[in-house]
Amino acid sequence: MFSCPILRKEKILQELEAERLRRQNLIKEDLQKKYAELQRTGFPLSECIGFIADLGGSNEIAYHYELICEDWERDDPLHFDNSFDKHDLAGIDFLFAAINKASTEKILVFTAYLIAEILVRSKHRDFHTAACNRLVPILVSLTNTKDCVLRRKALIAVGWVGAVQEIGIFNERMLHDEDSLCRAWSASGLWQLSCNRLHSQTILPEVKDVFRQAIAAEKDLFACGVMIESAQSLFGKKWISSIAVENEDAAKIEKARKSAVRFLTKDEI
C-alpha cells in the first residue's frame, strides 16, 4: 500500500538530483546562449526564473557576477543576484575579491551589500561569524560615502552583520545624518542587530537616551515613525503600527512620539 508514494518520492529525488547535475555541468557558453535567447525574447519572467536558478547551480561564478553587475545598472533589474548564495563559500570568497577590484563606488557598495544579504541567510553556517567580521570594516567605511542612496544600503547591511562595536555608528547617524532615510535605517539597524548577532539586552543601555533624543527631534514623519517602531521592537512596547508608519499618519505618529519619549525618559526601564 505504500509502494506508490515511496516510488513517487524516489522519482522526485532522482529528478531533483538530475537537475542539480545538469546545472552543475553548465559551462559559460551554455549560459551565454540562454542569456542571448532571453534578450531576444524580452526577458519573459518564467524563463528568467529558470535562468537565475541555472546561474546559481552552475560553477560559472565569474560570469554570474558579471551579469549581476550589468543587472544593477538596469532601471528594472532582473534580480540575477537572487541565486548567488547557491555558490556557497566559494561565492562569498569571490565577492570579497571582487570588492578589491570594483570599478565604481556603486559596484563596491552593492557587492558588499550582496555579501551581507547572503550572510544573513547563512547564520547556521560555520563560516558565518568569520565572514561577518571580515565584512563589517568594509561596510563601516562605506557608511561615510557622500552618496546618500549608497549610504542607506551600507547602513542596512551593517544591521545584518554588525556587532556591539557598530551600535555607536547607528547612534551617531540616527542623531546627525543629513538624510532622513539614513536616520531611519540607522534606527532600524539597531533593531536588526538584535535580530542577528546581538541580544537586545546588550543594546538597550546604549541606545535608550539616543532614541529619546532622536524621536523627540525628528522632523520627517516617516523617519520618526521608523524610529518609534524600531524602539518599540527593542523595548517590547506597542506605540504604533507598521501601516501608520508606511502611510505617514501624522496624528498616529505624533501620539506615538509622545508615548515613546515619555517611556524613554524614565530613569529605569
Placement of each model-derived feature along the sequence:
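Alpha-helix N-cap/helix-start positions at coil->helix boundaries
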Residues: E73-R74, T104-K106, C148-V149, D179-L181, ...
